Amino acid sequence: MEKVVTLNHDLPLLHFPNSRKPFSIPSPILRISSFKRHKKRSCLASSSRLGFYTETKTVSESHGVIVDNSTIGRRLLGLAAAVSVAVSLSIFCDSPALAESLTIAFPVSRAREVTTVQRTLVEAWGLIRETFVDPTFNHQDWDFKLQQTMVEMFPLRSADAAYGKLKAMLSTLGDPFTRLITPKEYQSFRIGSDGNLQGVGLFINSEPRTGHLVVMSCVEGSPADRAGIHEGEELVEINGEKLDDVDSEAAAQKLRGRVGTFVTIKLKNVNGSGTDSGIREVKLPRDYIKLSPISSAIIPHTTPDGRLAKTGYVKLTAFSQTAASDMENAVHEMENQDVQSYILDLRNNPGGLVRAGLDVAQLWLDGDETLVYTIDREGVTSPINMINGHAVTHDPLVVLVNEGSASASEILAGALHDNGRAILVGNRTFGKGKIQSITELNDGSALFVTVAKYLSPSLHEIDQVGIAPDVQCTTGMIDSLTAEIVEKMNSSVPLLEADSCVMVAEHELEARRSNGTAS
């Protein structure tokens, strides 16, 4: 999932029909009023208010402003700031003309948790109205969708049901990448983005045949590592709760917690014959866990003329906030060990933060190269260029890609390939040429909005097309080497040398060295 900086867009103001006919509202209403908003080229001055009314009353509309004809009931103003932001952010103007006043009235649920989601709905609706890449909103009336969804939420009694309605509204945009995740889901997402968590350092996954939770590896130096937990052990219980029908993400959430607290787990040791060899109980302290998206190894080999050469292998599993700095450190370390060429493995890397992808590209390029082109909602194509870049190394480079390389992986591969820096080896990439902004909303949920499409530096379409490699290969051993496999250099080199695509990459690097080709 990715973060970009988006610019202001020119949008029309909302217009609602004015009516002088009184009408009765037999339920609380949410009222958003914005008065005397002056359109300016780059900003919007507005005054917005939100009120909740808990009694039945008669209201009349005149010139777009709601006027109460009865005594105002108990008013809760705690949400005013949030809705004010949602309204003001959704409108950007380009002329000094005076805008009309605007009032929107919606029925507000009496269930507090549903009311919170209604507020999130308004917030999400405004952000999409401002930034979504398709200004037609999939050829529908986006203003009406807000009213319709708010009314549909009114009779609900649970936040889960209300979030379901919000997500259903987003699905009408026809873009699977524009979506909302709940506060709990967002916390898990952030762990993958910032590379830090509080837990025990276990990598677990569901065994495909049985569905049992199996330990894949431990983070080196973590509580799990210090306790001697091994790859292949089956996790059967957490704090007395059996894990039947519990998926790996739910189990991982149970293992996480505040530093200094403890979690007790039970592990089943399965021997090589597949039979059980006992269950043991382990009490683990939770600690800060540092996750790196980078793993590396040095592959020594002998050249045709008998010289010893070294190839640096770098596996990037995701584009987190630390990806560029971690990669820079890994390359510097290998440069100090006289590495003469590099393989950058992006296979099965689904993407992440776009900014991280651009930062990684700049580690390999010089000058003012174009890294990618973006196409905004108005169809305007704009380049994103480096400024006085200085590569960490100029040694020859091969990038490994496959059908699992997506989004920021494709931005990076395209930038290195189209600027003549790297050869691509593998299979055609996934083809996700859309960029999402990520915004944390007031309730702790997060909204992903597709704000732009992107093209490679050679203006090649990527979305739903992908990037074709220069040299095709399919890994014979396994689809891709995971970070856990290549974490320890000594044990990883034989595995790397058995990877057919790594072998192809080494052949291409040797050919470039023999031909004296610059990278």
From Swiss-Prot:
Alphabetical keyword list: Chloroplast, Hydrolase, Plastid, Protease, Serine protease, Thylakoid, Transit peptide
Keyword Membrane set for record: no
Keyword Chloroplast belongs to the record: yes
SMART domains for this protein: PDZ, TSPc
Pfam families: PDZ_6, Peptidase_S41
UniProt-listed GO biological process terms: proteolysis
UniProt catalytic activity: The enzyme shows specific recognition of a C-terminal tripeptide, Xaa-Yaa-Zaa, in which Xaa is preferably Ala or Leu, Yaa is preferably Ala or Tyr, and Zaa is preferably Ala, but then cleaves at a variable distance from the C-terminus. A typical cleavage is -Ala-Ala-|-Arg-Ala-Ala-Lys-Glu-Asn-Tyr-Ala-Leu-Ala-Ala
Transmembrane regions listed in the UniProt entry: none
Coiled-coil ranges per UniProt: none
Listed GO CC annotations: chloroplast thylakoid lumen
Active site: 407, 432
Record function comment: Protease involved in the C-terminal processing of the chloroplastic D1 protein of photosystem II. This proteolytic processing is necessary to allow the light-driven assembly of the tetranuclear manganese cluster, which is responsible for photosynthetic water oxidation.
NCBIfam families, sorted: prc
Name of the featured protein: Carboxyl-terminal-processing peptidase 3, chloroplastic
Organism in which the protein naturally occurs: Arabidopsis thaliana
